[in-house]
Amino acid sequence: MAIECSGRAGRTGGPGGPGAPGPDGPPPARVVPLLALACGSSVATVYFAQPLLVTLGERFALDPALVGVIVTLTQLGYAAGLLLLVPLGDLLDRRRLVTGQLGLLALALLGVGLAPGAAALLVALAAVGLLAVVAQTMVATAAALTPPARRGRAVGTVTGGIVTGILLARAASGVLADLAGWRAVYLVSAAFTAVLALLLRRALPAVMRSEGPGGAPSERPGGSGGSYARWVASTVTLFAREPLLRIRGTLALLVFAAFSTLWTGVARPLSDPPWSLSSTAIGAFGLAGAAGALAAGVAGRWNDRGLARRTTGVGLAVLVLSWLPIGLTGRSLWALAAGAVLLDFAVQAVHVTNQTVIHAVRPEAGSRIIGGYMVFYSAGSALGALGSSLAHAAGGWPMVTALGAAFSLAALLLWAATLRTAPPVG
């Protein structure tokens, strides 16, 4: 997607005048690392609740069969934000958008930390999910601030912040909860997010906006009326017209349903006898996500060699097999750790491949395509979270394992069905 400067930005510099950061000059050294930190912190808020589900369910007297709604509402909020808020990054001044959303995210986190009852908790968590999509806007901001020759490194740094945030979220949540109670997790995050908003307000220049659908400069809402609605609708239109986008989106839905089935459901068997683990220990299992970071690099290299379809097949086969050791959680924590490593490796391999393949369909619409794709991701995460709780209530951990394996097998069968399509779908 082409980027152009708004206001007075030109070839001599960014919006601040000659020598200011912009597409033709590197941003200040502190900006990209600060964006990476803010991205990781924002995305982490979506995953804080996973090791705390048992505690939250008891504290707010939630039915065990519905405790997964805590994660489900957060993910549904995130999906709504991807569709409704992320497109604003191509219409409004990103500095104001990023810092404003971070400020509102801090208030939503404060609402979670101070929630007096279940209804207030669930509303605040949905707001957290809605506003956490600011991470996607910050990725686009990093790209817009960096010249093409250095853009890949900048985006890679910021995306690395997202992976790190996901990786550390569960562990940090568990440690803080054990040290100071579950509310401290959200109150500390609220304060940290507010500080990041202030720092970015000072560090970011008035940044760029993108071209609108069809290549014309994007309009500001209210400029000619209805531009925001048309921009959102254009994302839906892209997926309606391109079969590959729908197939890869469905794969994302199934893969992340399996992912969420594990990480939402695993708190229950780990907190119950014979393990009776603390929140810290439960959160530490999230560190198995380090395998996901490794998988992202491997999958990227395979995709560059034209092996996207094979990478997808291998990843989905590993995903199915990962549920064999996961099913032995009641007997061995080592089995769970091994299964979690395999699952996270497989999920990230498929996820990176999906994004590589779909971006190539319409590179000029890359932001809208990735945003639309991430809606499938969030819907799958919400489905897995709710399904995991219902499955555990119905048949315990064996039923949760069966559900996760079913999502994984469905994804593998969908991929196998595409092998006969012409032209190939990635």
Model-based region annotation:
Residues 17-26, 205-249:
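Juxtamembrane intracellular "pre-TM" segments in multi-pass secondary transporters
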Residues 80-118:
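Conserved MFS/SLC helix-loop-helix module at the cytosolic interface between two early adjacent transmembrane helices
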Residues 81-93, 295-308, 392:
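Helix-to-loop junctions at the C-terminal end of transmembrane segments
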Residues 125-162:
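Cytoplasmic helix-loop-helix junction between adjacent transmembrane helices
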Residues 156-202:
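Helix-loop-helix hairpin linking two adjacent transmembrane segments in secondary transporters
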Residues 190-212, 414-418:
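C-terminal membrane-cytosol helix-exit motif in multi-pass small-molecule transporters
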Residues 309-354:
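C-terminal transmembrane helical hairpin of 12-TM major facilitator-type secondary transporters
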